[in-house]
Amino acid sequence: MTARHSFALALAAAALAPSFALASDDAPAAPPARAAAADKLGQARAQIAARQWSAALDELRRVNDTGSADWNNLMGFVLRKGKTPDLAASEKYYDAALRIDPHHRNTLEYSGELYLMKGDLAKAQARLATLTTECGASCEQTGELKAAIDRYKAAGNKYVSTGW
């Protein structure tokens, strides 16, 4: 491989690195079909990945794309994960996201986790059942919500945060 090819390969890898970082297992990722709409959410996603909840909330409010399931999902996520979680507002945004797209996998997972935070195991299990129907037992969101439910049960029906 020539130095020119090595440089081009390194440049391409560097350009793609932020994309991979933002698509980590813990941060909400945009489905490929929503890539164009997700561009305007990119800054908020970066702030979420950095756990800058207040900045992410400000950015999402600036974008104000209430007709987007992704936007509503991110609003719910930020409000649930912030320093002082607003569970009622988070639920409102998750519900809005699911009205727009009833198959939104991240919203199904995150709203299930919200229900665990609220002590509603039955609703969390219902979200898990929907996810299992949507994408099977092997999809990431199903596994994450199942693990959260297992932690909840193991802790005597108390929510256990993963630090995210």
Report the location of each language-model feature:
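Structural marker of alpha-solenoid helical repeat scaffolds
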Residues: 63-66, 100, 133-137
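Canonical tetratricopeptide repeat
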Residues: 74-75, 79, 110, 144-148
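Residue at a conserved register position within TPR or TPR-like alpha-solenoid repeats
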Residues: 47, 79-80, 115, 153
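TPR alpha-solenoid repeat register
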Residues: 71-73, 107, 141
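Structural signature of tandem alpha-helical TPR/SEL1-like repeats
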Residues: 50-55, 83-96, 119-127
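Alpha-helical segment of the N-proximal tetratricopeptide repeat
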Residues: 35-63
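Terminal, low-structured helical/coil segments at or just beyond the last alpha-helical repeat
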Residues: 3, 7, 26-35, 125-164
